[in-house]
Amino acid sequence: MSLKTFKPYTKSTRGTVLVDRSGLWKGKPFKLLTSVNNASKGRNNQGRITSRNHGGGHKQKYRTVDFYRRKFDSIAEIERIEYDPNRSCHIMLVKFEDEKKFYYLAPQKIKIGDKIQNGSNIEIKVGNCMPLQDIPVGIDIHNVELQPGAGGKIARSAGTSVNITGVDGNYSLVKMASGEVRKINSRCMATIGVLSNPDKKNIKIGKAGRSRWLGIRPHTRGVVKNPVDHPHGGGEGKTAGGRHPVSPTGQSAKGLKTRDNKRTDKFIIRRRKGKKK
């Protein structure tokens, strides 16, 4: 995939940079693997806003992607590579020898007609899915399970991958993109390769309307609100807020550590490093 630029015929095309999807499937998604996508629009079951600035957006159908990859002892052929509005990377429709079809996450360097497999003792090849214990050190992988049989949880976004750096007994040492090194059970499944659409990070939306198509609503700064609406609100004239940046509920917005999961701390070998400013 490459990037697509536009001539500045209008204000909305000036500076716009999008991903070129000309090489993707142009038809409708596979009907048996789609369902209605009833997005919550940032509301909970009581209708109250729990995630601000979400709502609207173009109507979408949810593509049921198989993150488990548990169909073994069969070879699948890639029928097509598709755009998925529900995630940043592309997906691929594969057909197995018994005619069953699945949606999988599409890695880079894969093309229509390629053959892929799931299971143990198979070829180290882009698109193949196997246990961590069968993957050599230094290979890029994605869609990694945290618990055997629980389905892929790590490295599922566009252009992402993680790397096996070593082995410790029944565990593999996996280095995340953040720099964190984590112990994962060697029986967990992972897929070879780096995920597709790495240029996603380089796009420029170009206009407010495209954000609304994506379901992103306008964001209002707290400092311009009233005191009843935000801790930074109020003041005579233009003020700087008068306190350290916080969220509308008063939680620090600058580097407060919110992780509280002592149960899995023992699996983290090295913490991620913060970016130097």
Residue locations for each model-derived region?
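Structural recognition of beta-strand segments within beta-rich domains
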Residues: 86, 94-96
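Short acidic-glycine loop/turn motifs at beta-strand connectors
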Residues: 96-99, 177-178
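Basic, glycine/proline-rich low-complexity segments that contact nucleic acids
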Residues: 1-87, 108-277
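Beta-strand/loop nucleic-acid-binding surfaces
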Residues: 99-111
